[in-house]
Amino acid sequence: MPIGIFDSGIGGLTVFKEIAASFPKVDLYYLGDTARVPYGNKSKTTIIRYSVECASYLYHNYNVDAIVIACNTASSYALDTLREILPIPVIGVVQPGAESAVKVSKNKKIGVIGTSATIKSNSYFETLKSLDKDLEIYQKACPLFVPLVEEGWIDNEVAKLTVKEYLDDLVKTGIDTLILGCTHYPLLKNTIKGLYPHLNIVDSSVAIVEHLKNIKLNIEETGKRKIFITDESHAFDKLKNMLVGDIKTEKIELSDLCSL
């Protein structure tokens, strides 16, 4: 059972890494839409269109049996559409992340950080409230985090100052749990944890693995790994090598996506 995974860029590799470690014999195909990153400042219509193009490319070209939307923005806006048009399971990152946060929070005060589009969608707020109506939820858009990660600035002084600028006031609300509502953000996890060691940091990529375990997977495959991008990116290659090793990156043309 090959699995297709897509994101707007680098961040979804954090999900790819967790899935690859848990399912070493399952074929994985990853598409990073680096030509159009970030999705977080795009309109809902555009986000859905990009997501349909990426998912359709993986489904039609590699016959994947499940799609993982390794992008919180795309999960927030395009999950229902993809489930309607594709005859295979489609897994987003919002529900797994929300469920994990509810499990680990002791004081029921949960912070959510994400792109402007993800926060505006209220997807985490609504999902969390559906799980526990007594939760106190504090949300914060952190639009500069994605460019930081895409540049590879994940643990330098600029990263620390930017994290503090966004999160100091959020932490003062008394939250004990913080959902990283963007798959780019786990690359800043060590910086965030270093500044706020008392927080439970929720990375939905780990929770996604548990959801995949509920799907019957064909483990008789070769464990093939393929990574595609829509534009050349030195930062992508650098972080790819750090996260998942020396897997060859293949560039595909946007016209190949848009023609589907």
From Swiss-Prot:
Keywords: Cell shape, Cell wall biogenesis/degradation, Isomerase, Peptidoglycan synthesis. Gene3D superfamilies: 3.40.50.1860. It is an enzyme of class 5 (isomerase). The active site is at 71 (proton donor/acceptor), 182 (proton donor/acceptor). It catalyses: L-glutamate = D-glutamate. One of its GO terms (biological process) is cell wall organization. Its EC number is 5.1.1.3. It comes from the Bacteria. Signal peptide: none annotated. GO terms for molecular function: glutamate racemase activity. HAMAP family: Glu_racemase (MF_00258). Belongs to the aspartate/glutamate racemases family. This is Glutamate racemase.
